[in-house]
Design a protein with these regions (language model features):
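Histidine-centered metal-chelating micro-motifs
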Residues: 122, 193-197
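Ligand-binding loop in jelly-roll beta-barrel domains
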Residues: 199-209
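Short beta-strand segments enriched in hydrophobic/aromatic residues
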Residues: 139, 194, 214-216
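Preference for bulky hydrophobic residues occupying beta-strand positions
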Residues: 31, 137, 212-214
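Non-heme Fe(II)/2-oxoglutarate
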Residues: 2-101, 113, 120-123
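Catalytic core of non-heme Fe(II) oxygenases with the double-stranded beta-helix
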Residues: 111-189, 206, 220
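Double-stranded beta-helix
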Residues: 213-231
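OB-fold and OB-like single-stranded nucleic-acid-recognition modules
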Residues: 85-88, 92, 96, 107, ...
């Protein structure tokens, strides 16, 4: 685990104008998947990936949840590591003391799995246990879902086929949910204990995505051995 030493207090510099401070609650990170990652992950899924049914470890009411094959994931770990470190680094840079120079964070992907969702499928509100970070990436959307969304937009609360993140309670200047209408290439990273849910859609076809659980450890620069591995 990466040890973050939170600041005991903040010192404000001289601001030229108004500067908003955001000390409370988690952020949701967004990036765009490389085209080659989308292509390789789709090919991996279509050939059966690892062949390991991952659904007993999950809560989704969906068509299929299957573990990624390591060979498909391996060429793309640099992208996911960079995003994870950027995400944690952004938070640490604002709220934590600087890391000692001899400590270098190292990203570990604990598990990664594909989710194949058909019309009527859904994922109940849930969190990811025994991890620090989780993520969702989108690989395929059902053809014609834009028409369903256009019709849903006429309703008072469009949510069909959306993913919703949930944290905290409602307040005057705080909304406890974030609804996202996903598209192919979207990649979201967030703390593993952030609740989220996926709503069903009606369009015939498949929405394909993947999720991962991620840990970050402290790797010492001098010998590359994680601190927790030392005797």
């Amino acid at each position: 685990m990466l040890h973050l030493e939170h600041k005991s207090y903040y010192e404000m510099g001289t601001s030229k104008g108004f500067v908003p401070l955001r000390p409370f609650g988690p952020s949701i990170g967004h990036a765009t998947l490389p085209e080659q990652t989308i292509k390789d992950f789709n090919a991996d899924f279509e050939k059966g990936a690892s062949g390991v049914d991952w659904s007993p470890n999950l809560v989704g009411k969906v068509a299929q949840e299957i573990l990624m094959s390591p060979d498909a994931l391996r060429p793309h770990t640099r992208f996911f590591s960079d995003v994870a470190l950027h995400y944690v680094g952004d938070y640490a840079g604002r709220h934590c003391e600087p890391f000692p120079e001899d400590i270098k964070p190292k990203v570990h992907i604990q598990s990664g799995w594909y989710v194949s969702q058909k019309e009527g499928d859904f994922n109940p509100v849930h969190l990811h246990t025994n991890t620090e970070l989780s993520c969702i990436g989108y690989l395929q959307m059902p053809e014609g879902i834009e028409e369903e969304w256009a019709k849903d937009d006429e309703d008072h609360y469009p949510c069909k086929g959306h993913v919703e993140f949930v944290h905290g309670t409602h307040s005057f200047l705080g909304k406890p949910t974030m609804m996202v209408r996903p598209k192919v290439g979207d990649f979201f990273i967030f703390p593993g204990d952030v609740m989220h849910t996926v709503y069903p859609f009606e369009t015939k076809g498949e929405r394909r995505s993947f999720s991962m659980n991620i840990l970050i450890t402290e790797k010492e620069k001098d010998n590359g051995i994680p601190k927790e591995a030392k005797s």
